[in-house]
Amino acid sequence: GMIVETGEESYETAPGETVGFNQDTEDFNEGRIKLIPKSGEIQFQSVNRGIGTPSYGGTIEVSLYDEGIVVVNEVGIEDYLKKVVPSEMPSGFNLEALKCQAVCARSYAYRQMASYGYPEYEAHVDDSTAYQVYGNSQPQERSTQAVNATCGEVVMYHGQIATTYYYSTSCGETTSLEAWGTPVNDENGYLQAVEVSGKVGDYEKDLPWYRWEAAIPVQTLSTLVEQNLGKGLGMIRDIQVTKKGPGGVVLQIKLIGENGDATVDTENKIRAALGGNGYEIKKQDGGVVPSSKLLPSAFFTVEKGADIFLIK
């Protein structure tokens, strides 16, 4: 069961009892609704994640906004990590790798706690890849072991907690904050371009996303560029990589269209400009997935064919 607080009033629910909220729920007239589990976790039956129906510990605050109902989960950092680490790294990985992931995730979380990522909701982060994936997997024994073994440990740089950006798969190189248009300085100098390799080659050379390619029809790409940039460039005649950054990341492209040209800067904006639905991404293991709103990476080259652009 749980305690439901609405304004100055509160009531308890029985174990297993379902409580529903919608835009017409009168309790919203009192402001936020707070849900406090008496024991265990609160399950969200209307939410679907990789594990199916997720459940959350800590307290839950439910608020009504013009755009819909917003759910904010307040949870202790170590309990949070027990659902982040298995969501970001398979629990079957080596324990030392999981411990590294736990330290990175903890460091990243503490840095985000310095300010609200969503000030309008008084929330530091969300549960997606925009920050760290949370709750897409239940706590796993090995992942929890890694979190417990590193409890409280963070990465430090010049007396401050480092911002530990990480990724699922590299192409054999990392890059610096220049990828996002941020100048390198004394505060972020630890984020450098390095080779991710050893004596037998790149560490990730056998992973599906180590190499990928997309053969995008010119018509499809032209339509996506117009949608993504809001500019009527017409049929795209060429894509030129005009600037690369540390590690080989693409920092600037020039789109040449029949009605004009456009320049796009920084990693995320470039991926967004060339992303969208309508084509397929082929991974090096032969697997094929539909395109999404972002190109998989900004480490790529472009080849122009008769009626396609080959990005890989």
What role is predicted for each listed range?
Residues 1-312:
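Conserved, single-site charged/polar hotspot
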